[in-house]
Amino acid sequence: MSPTTITLIFLAFAVVMFVTEKIPLAVTSMIVCIGLVITGVLNVNDAFSGFINSNVILFVAMFIVGGALFETGMANEIGSLVTKFAKSERGLIVAIMVIVGVMSGFLSNTGTAAVLIPVVIGIAAKSGYKRSRLLMPLVFAAAMGGNLSLIGAPGNMIAQSALAPLGLSFGFFEYAVVGLPILIAGILFYATIGFRILPNHDTEEDDSIFDETQDFGSVPKWKKVLSLVILIATLMGMIFEEQIGVKLCITGCVGALLLILTGVISEKDALKSIDLKTIFLFGGTLSLAKALEVTGAGELIADKVIGALGDHPSPVFFTLVVFLLCCVMTNFMSNTATTALMAPICLSIAQGMGADPRAVLMACVIGGSCAYVTPIGMPANTMVVGAGNYKFIDYAKSGLPLIVIATVISMIILPIAFPFYP
């Protein structure tokens, strides 16, 4: 059996297990990871490289930073402040989505989510609303906000790089032509109809540090202040990532280490704050994304779908197929891998049709950002699985309508703003 076929079998297995949850999500990920090694599709280094992926390192660091906010009670104090201004659950959801959406346009969407997840959990604790209803809008807003600027998401820069040899480019805010209407529509949706379909789970505290009932009266004031100062410093380091030349994950690690070294959080509590289910789920799933890439299975799927359109497909229909194909792929591969895979295919077909490559790539990028229906679609989705006590189906129920909204808006705006034959 060829490596491509084996990879597709593991993909099908993962989809079925993720949807049915007959076994835990993290266990499914590890079965796939180890299975790809046993079958010879990947070597050990490639299969387990996901566990030293920069996003996993960022997860670990920000779990500790978030844990410090909770251990000191600062997250609850921030929550109290926010709830004074947003009196209702709907108001909180709108406020969270607006703040996260705007921040994601200028800071990476993963970095934005990583910084604000502990804050939102604190808001949930003080407001009395279930965190499962606040965290999902947060990560969806992070994904939508990534399409407000050139630097909002890695896929945006990949598309820009693909255009460079052709002497073409996207403007800094050109993604917002499509991205901003989707963000606005998404916020309105979850403030109205979507409000009713958000998950409504009680959280499993276990021995997690994120204890909403803890008494913080004995915590020294300096610990609270220092935890907030380090959080803000970490955020600023992430915002100015390009200028200071330090990657997000390293900035997060510096913040986490400072919290431990200064005694704001103990080593024991720092380790307790790390959600291992999230780490195993994300790290293991990256092996599947790697296999789809190196075996050509992902390219095979794309080629078969695009090839079925024929030599001269309708521009609108072709745009729709590219958009939806990227939507599907990005929910099982990363946004970055999806755009990197699809960009050369789309460019080749666009040039063959004599179409504007920018039109096709914009559909590719926007579709590739619609990672709303699985917990593995983007790092932020995975980060909140444990905190929100989410199941796979929760993402599908809450995220699928958002994909429909994004598709409708894109198919209206793309032909007007980025015509195939300008």
Residue ranges and their predicted role:
Residues 27-32, 109-117, 136-137, 148-152, ...:
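Hydrophobic alpha-helical membrane segments of integral membrane proteins
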